[in-house]
């Protein structure tokens, strides 16, 4: 018998206005990616999606650029949108939007080409996500996002960004599972434009442990005590996230951690279509999250960013071309999130 598929969201004008506002907000799109989203996508739970909207702004202190005697000021923006479109206990459709941006004020130039440094770098993506539970207990699905990552997004097809993943979750006992997947991206740090297979094992012996380890990623969540959580994730080749958090009071969470991350953008009017402008940085940070409503939170944090640099090339081997080194320095960050 064909199952009826129930809609879980009404696309009301207010929510769509918020969504479009993030895209049009001073050309400042961003992108929030959380470790919890990895766990959700590969988890055995289906049909529990909620509408989600997060936005984060991170201004950095003005710093010097090595060898150019120029100042560099940057504010980083992130946002994440998820709209469940239809779901039941065995099937779910959702729409995912990710937005990332750097608002930049500087007179720095790219040293090899002598071009002025972009005053903004934006990454805007949107696409569907699908998951289904089959009669044998397997879960299969995937997602596809299409967008543009550039100083001038959507200026031409040369700035188009495409990411796609297909996966299967194969149960191994009551709580554990194998995960096999195939991913493609034209804006990946390594093996760019290459369909990349992967395999991992989901190990969850209790509610205190969740380990997803394999190729090409690893994710670990551990709760040694009721109010203490530890998280770690790794993505090849230079993306690391580690965090420890403590539930101080019921609505208050304090945390600290380390991030090593990177971003890539297709500059408009670049000479080589395979080149991207890369940004790398490491962060140490601490913060507090206040769940002021059951479905809303406010997050304030501060930290120190170091090993910050940009370069232009096809991959990390080109890291000395058009390289711009930004001095280490502090930053602050504010994030708000809503669940409906």
Set out the residue ranges of the language-model regions.
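Outer-membrane beta-barrel "beta-signal"
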Residues: 198-202, 286-296, 302, 323-340
């Amino acid at each position: 018998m064909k199952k009826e598929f129930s809609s879980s969201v009404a696309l009301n004008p207010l929510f769509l206005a918020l969504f479009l506002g993030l895209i049009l907000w001073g050309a400042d799109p961003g992108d929030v990616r959380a470790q919890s989203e990895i766990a959700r996508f590969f988890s055995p739970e289906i049909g529990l999606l909620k509408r989600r909207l997060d936005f984060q702004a991170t201004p950095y202190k003005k710093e010097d650029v090595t060898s150019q005697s120029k100042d560099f000021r940057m504010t980083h923006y992130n946002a994440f949108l998820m709209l469940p479109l239809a779901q039941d206990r065995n099937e779910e459709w959702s729409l995912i939007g990710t937005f990332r941006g750097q608002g930049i004020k500087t007179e720095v130039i790219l040293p090899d080409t002598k071009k002025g440094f972009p005053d903004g770098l934006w990454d805007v993506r949107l696409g569907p996500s699908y998951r289904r539970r089959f009669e044998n207990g397997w879960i299969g699905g995937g997602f596809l996002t299409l967008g543009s990552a550039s100083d001038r997004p959507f200026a031409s097809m040369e700035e188009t960004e495409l990411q796609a993943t297909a996966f299967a979750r194969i149960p191994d006992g009551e709580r554990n599972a194998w995960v096999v997947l195939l991913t493609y991206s034209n804006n990946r740090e390594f093996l760019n434009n290459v369909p990349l297979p992967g395999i991992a094992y989901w190990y969850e012996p209790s509610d205190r442990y969740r380990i997803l380890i394999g190729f090409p990623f690893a994710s670990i969540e551990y709760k040694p005590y009721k109010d203490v959580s530890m998280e770690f994730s790794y993505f090849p080749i230079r993306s690391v996230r580690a965090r420890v958090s403590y539930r101080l009071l019921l609505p208050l969470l304090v945390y600290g951690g380390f991030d090593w991350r990177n971003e890539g953008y297709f500059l408009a009017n670049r000479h080589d279509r395979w080149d991207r402008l890369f940004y790398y940085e490491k962060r140490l940070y601490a913060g507090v999250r206040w769940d002021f409503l059951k479905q809303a939170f406010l997050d304030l944090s501060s930290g120190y960013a170091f090993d910050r640099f940009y370069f232009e090339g096809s991959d990390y081997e080109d890291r000395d071309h058009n390289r711009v080194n930004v001095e280490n320095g502090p930053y602050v960050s504010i994030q708000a999130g809503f669940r409906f």
